[in-house]
């Protein structure tokens, strides 16, 4: 519950003037710096998300390092995105008597304050006390909300919705006409009447039902009184974060009204908010489930019956939300409940005091801690999970923010798995090229040969960190003399590549199989190959950090396949010489498929579900992915005369690349059954493997059996290359 002082009578709520300021400010869009992963983070939620609209419900940092803020704001910091609240510049923090209201002062001062707030347009719409209905309301605005749910009552809403700006006070169209004296704000008398009834639901409902005042249930935390979608068009790179449900469960606990029907209704509001965002064009939508309310100090002190009752509400709400969100599709659920359960089960592992954290808090609960509490012998909120009876301390908020960040960015690293398989295929291709180029315009020959290549690889592109590491391939082949001027062969190889920037290790091992052939008629030549790769990713290791203390490495493995085809043709432009040289063109195609997998974790990092099953809230399950790579080359070749003691061979070319240089990857949390969403993963346009470049391969025969070659590829962002050998028995 939230309490407000009596509004200062000097505050002027002049309808026409305020409407004029708002209308003047509308149409100006905020500008956020482009980020490689997400453009902006837009937050809707309750006190676990509120960054100042109704307050900030957590502790101060004892060391003064971190600002007082909720977990989504820590997430915004790590993503490098804006985090201001949607009513930034208004409300009690800036002198206003109530949330989203201007400070007392002259008319011009209030107009300027409101205009500045609208222009700032902070992306955090969280409001302490919000229920799930209020999250939907803030997303779609009053008009659309009433179309979707015309029958909500005070019981469905945060009491603050009665006094926040509401564009429906300006008429059905939601557009305030200053000439008609319309305003989204209440008069001072109406504010007084509404706030006086905050602790009396029946009295507040009577005010809402009274047609003779402007008190409504559809106020939103924005000075125009309009919701997010009526004023904004989602951009494909925006990330939408929704969190609510805890207050709905608490209401049911207090009133003894928890039921499957009530929790399903509460979940429906939240899933509908996700559905409305998706329908409007939002691409990345994530939600948290609700924490186990019975394990908070607000309920825990009441005994086992209250704990079990409250936690049954959490179980029902989270299950209904999961089912509904899965029906909408492509919305990721984060296991807030599970992470907090891990912390409460073993607080010392996460940097908190090794005590029963559910039974105590820093301040304002039944049992503030006698040592670390605000009035304890050694006050230190960082040693406690709970700030008050419900909300986490700043240390807890930061831990949750780290969890959100680690989960929402994991797809970036996993998106490099196809590239590792492709890098191995390229090394296999180097060995085939070494054989085909060195034998160009030579008589077909039946033999067995061995090859090996070692290459310098630059893996990582777009949001993925660049990491250089050698890749190698050992090749065994057989060639056969066919009919006149034709040689064909088969080969197999084993190759390996590794990608290991900080906190991530990916290793690919390829078993490659190819069939190849070459033909010439002393003028034209054609060669090509087709191949298949059996790829094993036995080392997929991701390390996460939560807070200052907790560190854990996840292990996983999976398999994949690779397919390839290539064709090259050219002609000898120096037929009067013993050597051969001329132009050529070539085309290569590779496809890499990677199967899905689940990260594995320790049993100590799981919690018990409703039926005793172990649930892993930190590990992820990753869906399969595939990627096409295409290369086209045009250049010149050279082969020295057959009579030369050391036969030189080589190619020089310009190459153009294409393929799947942009991809998202399906990610889900292990503990959330059958829920997943596609998150930003691979962004390699004009970078990484998808750069055009200039390349060359030059080799020489040391003797009749042994050849050595070097290859080099110069691209705008890097230079890669390597060495290869070929021995014919």
Region spans (language model):
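Residue-level recognition of beta-strand termini and adjacent short loop/turns
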Residues: 236, 481-485, 574-576, 643, ...
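Active-site pocket-shaping loop/turn-to-helix segments
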Residues: 142-143, 256-267, 557-562, 619-631
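Extracellular loop and loop/strand-boundary signature of outer-membrane beta-barrel proteins
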Residues: 305-309, 460-464, 498-504, 512, ...
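Outer membrane beta-barrel transmembrane domains
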Residues: 403, 514-518, 611-729
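Solvent-exposed flexible segments
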Residues: 588-594
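Gram-negative bacterial Sec-dependent N-terminal signal peptides
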Residues: 2-32
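Conserved active-site regions of diverse hydrolases
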Residues: 33-441, 454-461
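Outer membrane beta-barrel translocator domains of Type V secretion systems
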Residues: 419-581, 589, 708-726
């Amino acid at each position: 519950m939230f309490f407000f002082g009596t509004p200062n009578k000097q505050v002027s709520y002049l309808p026409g003037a305020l409407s004029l300021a708002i209308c003047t400010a509308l149409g100006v869009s905020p500008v956020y710096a482009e980020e490689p992963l997400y453009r902006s983070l837009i937050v809707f939620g309750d006190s676990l998300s509120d960054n100042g609209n109704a307050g900030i419900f957590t502790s101060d940092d004892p060391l003064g390092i971190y600002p007082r803020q909720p977990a989504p704001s820590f997430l915004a910091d790590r993503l490098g995105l804006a985090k201001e609240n949607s009513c930034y510049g208004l409300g009690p923090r800036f002198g206003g008597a109530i949330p989203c209201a201007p400070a007392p002062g002259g008319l011009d001062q209030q107009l300027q304050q409101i205009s500045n707030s609208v222009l700032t347009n902070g992306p955090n719409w969280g409001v302490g006390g919000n229920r799930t209905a209020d999250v939907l309301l803030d997303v779609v605005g009053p008009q659309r909300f009433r179309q979707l749910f015309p029958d909500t009552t005070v019981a469905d809403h945060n009491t603050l919705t009665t006094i926040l700006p509401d564009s429906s006070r300006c008429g059905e169209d939601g557009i305030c006409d200053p000439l008609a004296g319309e305003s989204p704000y209440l008069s001072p008398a109406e504010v007084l009447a509404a706030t006086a009834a905050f602790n009396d639901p029946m009295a507040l409902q009577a005010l809402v039902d009274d047609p003779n005042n402007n008190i409504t249930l559809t106020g939103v935390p924005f000075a125009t009184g309009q919701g997010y979608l009526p004023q904004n068009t989602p951009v494909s790179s925006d990330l939408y974060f929704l969190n609510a449900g805890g207050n709905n469960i608490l209401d049911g606990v207090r009133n003894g009204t928890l039921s499957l029907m009530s929790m399903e209704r509460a979940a429906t509001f939240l899933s509908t908010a996700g559905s409305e965002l998706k329908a409007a064009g939002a691409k990345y939508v994530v939600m948290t489930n609700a924490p186990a309310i019975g394990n908070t100090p607000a309920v825990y002190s009441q005994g086992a019956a209250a704990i079990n009752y409250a936690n049954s509400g959490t179980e029902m709400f989270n299950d209904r939300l999961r089912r509904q969100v899965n029906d909408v599709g492509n919305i990721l659920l984060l296991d807030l409940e599970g992470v907090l359960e891990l912390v409460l089960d073993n607080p010392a592992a996460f940097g908190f005091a090794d005590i029963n954290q559910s039974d105590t808090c820093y301040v304002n609960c039944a049992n503030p801690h006698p040592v670390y509490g605000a009035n304890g012998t050694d006050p230190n909120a960082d040693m406690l999970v709970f700030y008050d009876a419900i909300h986490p301390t700043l240390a807890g908020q930061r831990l949750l923010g780290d969890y959100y960040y680690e989960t929402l960015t994991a797809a970036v690293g996993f998106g490099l798995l196809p590239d590792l398989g492709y890098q191995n295929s390229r090394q296999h291709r180097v060995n085939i090229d070494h054989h085909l180029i060195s034998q160009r315009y030579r008589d077909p020959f039946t033999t067995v040969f061995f090859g090996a290549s070692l290459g310098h690889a630059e893996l990582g592109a777009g949001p993925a960190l660049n990491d250089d590491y050698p890749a190698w391939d050992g090749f065994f082949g057989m060639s056969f003399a066919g009919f006149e001027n034709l040689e064909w062969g088969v080969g197999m190889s084993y190759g390996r590549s590794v990608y290991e920037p900080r906190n991530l290790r990916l290793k690919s091992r390829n078993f490659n199989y190819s069939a190849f052939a070459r033909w010439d008629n002393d003028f034209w030549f054609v060669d090509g190959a087709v191949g298949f790769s059996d790829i094993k990713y036995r080392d997929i290791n991701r390390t996460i950090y939560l807070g200052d203390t907790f560190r854990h490495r996840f292990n996983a493995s999976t398999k994949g396949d690779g397919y390839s085809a290539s064709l090259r043709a050219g002609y000898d432009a120096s037929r009067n010489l013993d050597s051969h040289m001329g132009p050529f063109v070539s085309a290569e195609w590779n496809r890499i498929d990677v199967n899905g997998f689940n990260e594995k974790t320790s049993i100590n990092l799981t919690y018990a579900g409703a039926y005793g099953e172990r649930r892993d809230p930190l590990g992820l399950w990753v869906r399969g992915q595939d990627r096409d790579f295409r290369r086209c080359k045009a250049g010149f070749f050279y082969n020295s005369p057959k009579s030369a003691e050391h036969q030189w061979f080589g190619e020089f070319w310009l190459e153009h690349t294409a393929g799947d240089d942009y991809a998202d990857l399906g990610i889900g949390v292990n503990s959330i059954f059958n829920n997943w969403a596609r998150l930003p993963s691979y962004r390699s346009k004009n970078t990484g493997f998808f750069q055009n470049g200039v390349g060359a391969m030059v080799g020489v025969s040391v003797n009749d059996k042994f050849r050595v070659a070097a290859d080099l590829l110069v691209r705008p962002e890097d230079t890669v290359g390597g060495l290869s050998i070929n021995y014919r028995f």
